[in-house]
C-alpha cells in the first residue's frame, strides 16, 4: 500500500450526514426511468449484482430490475444480508458464479456495490475464465481499510479486522482484476474515501466519476446508465467510457 493510501482519512462528518440524500436519489432514479430506457441494450449475458455491507438483494432490486429491462439475465447474490466473509460466504459466491456461467454457457459480469465490489474483484481474479467484466460502485479497494465511516460496523458484523486480507480469496485487493474493470466513484461519498475507490487506468481498466451519495449509488440514475453502457460492450471489444457530448455534463472528468 502506498504512503498516500495509508494516510487516507474517512469522509467528513458533513459528507456522512449528507448520505440522507440517498432517498432523493431513489426518487430521481424512478423519475428518470423514461430517459434510462434510452440506455444501450445488452446481449443477454448473465450479470451478478452483489450488495454492500449489511445490505441484501433488496437493496440492489432497483438496479437489477433496470438491468433486466436492458436484456440481461440478472441475479442477486442469494445470501441474505452481507455480513462480511463469514463461514461459507466465499464458497457460496464461487458456486453461484459457476452456476450462472455453466447454465448460460457464457462468461458473466460482476457488479458490486461497496463491499460487494470487493467481492467482485476477488472473484474475477480467482475465476477469470468465467468472468467477462467487473464494475464496482463506491468500493474501497485501494486505500487504508479504515478510511471509511463503516469499518467498525464491518468488524462487528463480520467478526474480522477491517485490515485483514484473506490471501485465499483473490490476493491483494488493490491488484487490478485480469478482466475489463470499471470503478465508479463519487467525491461526495460520505462513507468511503473516494480516493480509495479509484482504479489505476490501463488498457482494460478505468474510473467513472458520478455525483452521488454512497448509500444511493446503487439506484442513482447516472450510475445506472453508466453500468448499462459498460455492460453493453461486445465481449472482447472493451473501450473506455465515452464522456463526450451530453455525458460531459453528467460525468465529471475523474482525472481532474
Predicted regions, residues:
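Amphipathic alpha-helical segments
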Residues: 62-63, 227
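Short amphipathic alpha-helical segments enriched in hydrophobics
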Residues: 27-30, 57, 231, 235
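Short, mixed-charge, low-aromatic patches
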Residues: 15-22, 46-54, 179-187
